[in-house]
Amino acid sequence: MTRIAANDPVIHVRVATGDHRQPRYNRGMSLELLFLGSGTSAGIPMIGCDCRVCRSDDPRDQRTRPSVLIRYPGNEPGTSHQFLIDTAPEMRIQVIRHAITRIDGVLITHPHADHIFGLDDLRRFNVVMQGPIDLHAEEATLQRLQSIFGYIFEPHTNLNQSFVANLVPHPIKVGTAMTLCAARWTPLRLMHGRLPILGFRVDRGRESLAYCTDASGIPPETYPLLEDLDVLIIDALRYRHHPTHFTVDQALQQIEQLRPKRAYLTHMAHDILHADLESRLPKNVFLSYDGLVVNCSGDTERQPGLLQ
């Protein structure tokens, strides 16, 4: 493989959301993913940096912290479901950019700041949907969230009567698939340095995608769960070695082994200039960017918002 270097048992889960009114879903559309944020923990541009990526006027180089929206048709004609993976610090800005006013649930990969510090803003969805929101995560992650956001999960301890998010925690287990609104979700074990975290595989009918951010390793038992994918989203932080993230070359090696139909690199730092790297990638590998929509049918499009 050519190296890329810098040029310098199924669980059925009841949805707790109170508002069951759903937007119309375009006929013929399929399982798809919207990149709300494609950057690393510092975001791009970084504070106080004048490198060529942080100064780039290409909107694809302007990356907010990592989060995606998964959406797919519902069982009833003309309806859809959509789930948020992670709540980035810019979540409010991200969802407003893309006119997202309803979610069927939230899934958390791990409790690092760039993946959870938008959790408080879920309270606005409670108001719009007039009901609670399902929150799916591993038990250890739920405990960490309850520690960090005690005012949300134990509102009775707040000195003032505050308006906080109304969340319904659901512990999930690695490898135990669950049905969320007409799709099969399988939590995947990934390694983020020494920290075990989650990725997710989503199957609906014959379509499938997997989201594997913040990974530096894939355990042997996870590989079979990543076979026969239409779309793979995988971490590719930078060109140089990093102890807790795949490099570009390491991500390409994983893609070559897993052989998805298409793959997209995400969680990218300011080492990567979009136009430069994408021109040198294999034909079925692409760079993500904020606002990109990836459809399992093979279509991609720019989502209205950041790129307008």
Regions found by a protein language model. Name each.
Residues 1, 102-109, 202, 227-237, ...:
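A signal for specific C-terminal beta-sheet/loop modules enriched in small/flexible residues
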Residues 2-6, 16-17:
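Short linear motifs in low-complexity or flexible loops
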Residues 9, 25-212, 221, 278-307:
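Binuclear metal-dependent hydrolase catalytic cores
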Residues 17-18, 120, 224, 245:
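Alpha-helical transmembrane segments and their juxtamembrane interfaces
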Residues 19-25:
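Short, low-complexity segments with poor structural confidence in diverse proteins
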Residues 216-298:
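Cap/insert and terminal regions of metallo-dependent hydrolase folds
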